Amino acid sequence: AHSYNTDPEMVVTGKVLDSTHKEAMLWDIERGIPDRPQEKPWQTCTCIGGWHYGVKDYNAGYKSAQQVVDMLVDIVSKNGNLLLSIPLKGDGTHDDKEMRFIAEMTDWMEQNGRSIYGTRVWKTFGEGPLVDASNPIYNQGFNEGINYSAKDVRYVVKHARTEQDVDTVFATI
């Protein structure tokens, strides 16, 4: 209670929450995404490779920017937030593949950020093969690796700010 009284905008996260816990805490799904929109806001935490920097991850390759974009769009359409980790090398720098990933994500966000920031769940979150597919979350998450396709569409809405404006629905493929 002290923390909330000190900073009412503070967010406390938890991994395994029941409906009562979700009234006070933000559900944090590790490396996973629910298959349906959630009534309460939630987040997934993931990384482009392993949680810690390693040459093995560098050699194996990281998630592509397109994979993370697909995840981000799916997460936002289900009332979620993406917490993305890009590990640093021991000297505090990023490697060349991480820098390329960051540049590609930056380009996508500059072009499409309007469909992410300030948006809300629309009356339907999506269409396509993955809408009907079951992808259960195990324990606290760990259901990453969904293969999105061009047939998977996700929807969000940005509500009008004034009475003269209209709501904008974004469909991302």
Residue ranges and their predicted role:
Residues 1-173:
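Mature catalytic domains of secreted/periplasmic carbohydrate-active enzymes
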